[in-house]
Amino acid sequence: MLNQVVIVGRLVAKPIVEENENGRKVSEITLAVNRSYKNADGIYETDFIKCILWSCIAENTAEYCDKGDLISVKGRLQCLGGSELQVVAEKITFLSNNKNKEE
């Protein structure tokens, strides 16, 4: 069986690292991902995908990324119950940051 996804999108907020009850570092992020096709009104819709980052992946993403930055998340889908899913990140690639747009 294979459970692997790759998502490219923009961070909707600055990542924040917290420590869980076991002392592990964790960060929950949401990526805004534009669909590759237009809807009936001619508009590209956006999906908001929840991802969970652990340990050094969480710390590095929080240190080097900010709201609006484009990143790639490689990981696996995890069911949270019902129809709610999240991506458990195994690798993050920083593709671009929003700082260049401000200058």
Task: Give a label for each model feature.
Residues M1-E103:
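Single-stranded nucleic acid-binding surfaces, predominantly the OB-fold ssDNA-binding core
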